[in-house]
């Protein structure tokens, strides 16, 4: 990627490269929670396919989740450093050198090289877990795995603490379609006779007897045979898990009640969101998961948009029925070839950006005031003046934006 590319040009080149690699497994480090979200939204705003890395036989995987699961169940495979409070640290720039991998100063290319090296070591030292990671990088394979194994084992991380669970697959969420598992640390007999109302009260009281598997986010699922070699669970607990799973398997009524429970919780969640703010409060830039998918006709217009010149793209933007796509298209023309816009439209977009950037309130986006504070923070932290060139360049950009939108 050349430095003089615009954001749109960079996104187009990334898309072309990813398509050239496809079908592929796209692996990163904390990429599903961070990099992938940034990438998806960048593609979305550029009228490209935001789900490119998970469609058309493409899959995605996250090495951070794999390391957390591996360290929990098989802690001697990869070395994980600890901080001064004796807590394990999974930051890439610390895990890499701790395992003898040069990290290349935590720049983008260095992160890629370090991720590749860690992946190679996991594949060599824990081939079964590596295989499980690759299998679970595909949604359909996760569902197959759950249906084929009466008991599965997985980990969850909250506030830096990773915990292991054994669970039995019950149902898919009636709204969100995620697989729902019964947590086998609970006794299913305690729940079989409960009404939906009682199940709900029990769940909301803090007894989280059901667990959600985000099957589109590369969960690492392990079998009983794999976990028996771990030592994380007591053998007596594993025997009890087998008995509990058989109880669940023989009682379909609990699955029906769980579906009703999930429906109730989802309806309450929707009602709460409606009371807190309507769909009208959601900006186009944050609507990737909230505004639905484009119609077939809008998808066709998107394809025409890619092939057209900038003059033709303005007329295509007016044909979108999805107002978000029209908005993004107009913004792209404003940024890339503003001469193609009528003066009134160009002025409206310019003023909208000006209002956003000049706001002195706490906003969902970065304002010029936020930008200036970031520059000041970099200056304070740069005690040896090693970032002088970067700071100078950032100040020039800030000055340019101030003059452009004053």
What are these regions (language model features)?
Residues 135-214:
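Acidic catalytic cores of enzymes that act on phosphate-bearing nucleotides/polynucleotides
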Residues 204-247:
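Structured mid-domain segments that build the active-site/substrate or prosthetic-cofactor binding neighborhood
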């Amino acid at each position: 990627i050349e430095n003089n590319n615009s954001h749109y040009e960079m996104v187009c080149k990334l898309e072309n490269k990813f398509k050239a690699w496809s079908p592929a497994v796209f692996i990163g480090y904390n990429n599903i929670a961070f990099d992938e979200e940034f990438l998806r939204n960048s593609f979305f705003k550029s009228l490209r396919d935001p789900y490119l890395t998970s469609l058309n036989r493409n899959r995605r995987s996250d090495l951070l989740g794999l390391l957390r699961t591996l360290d929990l169940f098989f802690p001697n495979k990869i070395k994980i450093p600890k901080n001064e409070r004796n807590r394990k640290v999974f930051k890439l720039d610390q895990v890499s050198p701790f395992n003898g991998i040069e990290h290349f100063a935590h720049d983008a290319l260095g992160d890629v090289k370090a991720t590749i090296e860690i992946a190679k070591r996991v594949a060599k030292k824990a081939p079964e877990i590596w295989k499980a990671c690759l299998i679970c990088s595909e949604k359909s394979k996760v569902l197959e795995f759950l249906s084929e194994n009466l008991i599965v084992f997985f980990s969850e991380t909250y506030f830096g603490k990773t915990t292991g669970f054994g669970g039995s697959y019950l149902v898919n969420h009636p709204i969100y379609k995620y697989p729902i598992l019964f947590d086998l640390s609970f006794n299913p007999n305690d729940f079989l006779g409960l009404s939906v109302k009682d199940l709900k009260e029990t769940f909301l009281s803090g007894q989280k007897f059901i667990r959600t598997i985000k099957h589109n986010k590369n969960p690492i699922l392990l079998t009983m045979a794999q976990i028996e070699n771990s030592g994380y669970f007591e053998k007596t607990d594993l025997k009890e898990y087998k008995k509990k799973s058989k109880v669940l398997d023989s009682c379909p009524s609990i699955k029906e009640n769980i579906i009703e429970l999930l429906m109730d919780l989802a309806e309450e969640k929707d009602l709460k969101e409606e009371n807190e703010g309507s769909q009208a409060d959601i900006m186009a830039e944050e609507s990737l998961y909230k505004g639905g998918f484009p119609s077939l006709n809008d998808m066709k217009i998107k394809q025409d948009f890619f092939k057209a010149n900038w003059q033709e793209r303005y007329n295509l933007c007016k044909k979108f029925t999805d107002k978000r796509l029209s908005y993004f298209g107009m913004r792209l023309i404003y940024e890339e070839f503003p001469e193609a816009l009528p003066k009134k439209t160009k002025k409206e977009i310019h003023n909208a950006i000006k209002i956003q950037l000049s706001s002195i309130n706490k906003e969902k986006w970065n304002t010029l005031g936020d930008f200036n504070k970031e520059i000041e923070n970099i200056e304070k932290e740069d005690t040896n003046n090693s970032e002088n060139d970067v700071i100078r360049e950032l100040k020039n950009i800030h000055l340019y934006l101030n003059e452009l939108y004053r």
